[in-house]
């Protein structure tokens, strides 16, 4: 079941990271046993390891998952927008992200200033990415999801989830 | 007139000890453009001279004598150059005397300055000896130094040290454009100050018939200052300076024959000056505050958006779960109906029980087996 996009519009994920789209695939993400709903708060320490991202869709279709932080290094001055955290390609439909190929290794949220949004974007691939067809981004800062999608002809996203994260006080860090 | 002003300056001198003596300095830039030699001869000529030599005075006494002198003395030549110098000096903020400085004699301070200046000049020149050669040429003795420069370099004007440093640099090496001097000039306040100079100048000139001293030198010294002001203040300062000069001169001549004692103007102007003096800081503070406010508002908007997004997400979730729940209930109803049809002998309660407690049957079985064999 497709999620509503309204929270994404209000949370300015649509606009700052992706364009308006109609969700066609259901994607659920969970850090451990904690499900991620749009706009929920996740402690960075709880997100050290990649989340379990389950997607619907047909087994023959392949999907690309991108996780970025549009608020780096600070929401009021996002000079690094977007900071890339994760890219997984060739995820078969109906499975989870661990069945895909990690193109850019997962990096947990490390918000230094302010509350950052972390956006998980799912694209449907036109075809399987073989090694030569991919252009891995040079660097994590100043990544552009739209440009990446355009370059790899991914079209509009099929699902987006975002959560918030904030720097933890030192004593609460595990 | 002289007495009265002397009293005024004493009062202010006392205040200056507490760090609020910018008024006279700001009101008349002219006196600060005199060199020490000229200043001394001026004091002597007026009869209000102090017996002491400047070198042996401590800084506190020097300032006091400057204030006294400038109170009772007005420069009819307080023209463009003086005005510009005034702008330059005022920009430094209030004339405060650090404790450590006030007890030093002028000579001591001068020696300190010379010691500081030579390595600085050398560094500026890049070569070791070049700077030291130039330095003495520009400021061979204390006597030829202007009061303004001396005070600024001695660090009497402390509030805006960065600006002061930039100014000294500019004054010492005119062709070098100062990098950044905060543009705090405000033309309307500028005019207000010229008014103050006018009145004081006119009054004093009328009362005492004092003639300008050392026009050439001050203008020389002050052209540097005007350059600084021009650069620092950007486009604002240049035009007002010119117009107000004309206005000032005519006003000075017009009022010159009035012998009305207009001396105690400092207080109203002090207000203006204080406003202007702190104007730089206030402007900076206001700007900073505004930036902070904007950031804060953006942050608040983001926070609201976040909250709203989350609320919407939760509402959507609730809606979804409600629908799911209804669907499931409907399904349960159907199943129960089906069970009723398949096992007509079962009562509705039993069916419900079976559905709600699928292990109930099993439990009963277990109990029986437990009780059975023994």
Swiss-Prot record, chain A:
Gene3D superfamilies, A to Z: PEBP-like
Name of one Pfam family that matches: PBP
Q: What induces it?
A: Induced by abscisic acid (ABA).
Sequence intervals crossing the membrane? none
What is the role of this chain?
Answer: May form complexes with phosphorylated ligands by interfering with kinases and their effectors.
Report the family membership: Belongs to the phosphatidylethanolamine-binding protein family.
Q: What is this protein called?
A: Protein MOTHER of FT and TFL1 homolog 2
Q: State the species of origin.
A: Oryza sativa subsp. japonica
Swiss-Prot record, chain B:
Q: Does the keyword Nucleus apply?
A: yes
The Gene Ontology CC terms held by the record are: nucleus
Where in or outside the cell it occurs: the entry states: Nucleus
This entry's comment on induction and repression of expression is: By abscisic acid (ABA).
User: Which key words are in the record?
Assistant: Abscisic acid signaling pathway, Activator, DNA-binding, Nucleus, Transcription, Transcription regulation
Q: Which InterPro entries match?
A: bZIP, BZIP46-like, bZIP_sf
- Gene3D superfamilies on file: 1.20.5.170
Q: In which tissues is it expressed?
A: Expressed in roots, leaves and embryos.
According to the entry, every stretch annotated as the bZIP domain falls at: 286-349
For the keyword Transcription regulation, the answer is yes
Q: Name one GO biological process term.
A: regulation of DNA-templated transcription
Look up the coiled coil feature and give its residue ranges.
none
Region annotated Basic motif sits at 288-307
UniProt biased composition (Basic and acidic residues): 1-13
Molecular functions (GO terms):
DNA-binding transcription factor activity; transcription cis-regulatory region binding
Q: Where is this region: Disordered?
A: 1-23, 117-142
Task: Please list where the region (Leucine-zipper) is annotated.
Answer: 314-335
Q: Which domain of life is it from?
A: Eukaryota
Compositional bias of kind Low complexity: 14-23
Complex formation = Interacts with VP1 (via N-terminus).
Which family does the record assign? Belongs to the bZIP family.
Job description of the protein: Transcription activator that mediates abscisic acid (ABA) signaling. Binds specifically to the ABA-responsive element (ABRE) of the EMP1 and RAB16A gene promoters.
According to UniProt, the name of this protein is bZIP transcription factor TRAB1
Source lineage: Eukaryota, Viridiplantae, Streptophyta, Embryophyta, Tracheophyta
Gene encoding this polypeptide?
A: TRAB1
